[in-house]
Amino acid sequence: MAKKVSAYIKLQVGAGKANPSPPVGPALGQHGVNIMEFCKAFNAQTQEMEAGLPVPVVITVYNDRSFTFITKTPPAAVLLRKAAGIQKGSGEPNTKKVGTVTREQLEEIAKTKEPDLNAADLDAAVRSIAGTARSMGLDVEGL
């Protein structure tokens, strides 16, 4: 018989940087999950990614306190900030532009995000990422 799910926990944790301190420890502790076991498994799974890059993770906790987790791709905004070389987006995206991204950079980000985007093809994914870039105050070249 299948195990019964008791909770889903959604977190954003830096790649390779999971540790028992907040936010990871309290979120898992209240569901009775072995925190160190999760931290070791998560860090092992994300070790090939750039250290510290925020990675969304969905943890499924079962009644017997066992768990499974699925890592997603880093948020588009983080990848766009890295591509544009900026610290944060614009507070007034329509009036103050803070950087520029090219179509090639957007395609690279779209290929990275492809598993998590529900776009029909690469072009639709690029347009979606371009919309995120515009809302952050980035100029989009070549689109």
Swiss-Prot record:
CDD domains: Ribosomal_L11
GO cellular component: cytosolic large ribosomal subunit
One protein family per Pfam: Ribosomal_L11_N
Description of post-translational modifications: One or more lysine residues are methylated.
Gene Ontology annotations of biological process type: translation
Keywords: Methylation, Ribonucleoprotein, Ribosomal protein, RNA-binding, rRNA-binding
Molecular function terms, GO-annotated: large ribosomal subunit rRNA binding; structural constituent of ribosome
Role according to the record: Forms part of the ribosomal stalk which helps the ribosome interact with GTP-bound translation factors.
Subunit text: Part of the ribosomal stalk of the 50S ribosomal subunit. Interacts with L10 and the large rRNA to form the base of the stalk. L10 forms an elongated spine to which L12 dimers bind in a sequential fashion forming a multimeric L10(L12)X complex.
Family stated for the protein in its record: Belongs to the universal ribosomal protein uL11 family.
Name recorded for this polypeptide: Large ribosomal subunit protein uL11
Originating species: Alkalilimnicola ehrlichii (strain ATCC BAA-1101 / DSM 17681 / MLHE-1)
Native organism taxonomy: Bacteria, Pseudomonadati, Pseudomonadota, Gammaproteobacteria, Chromatiales
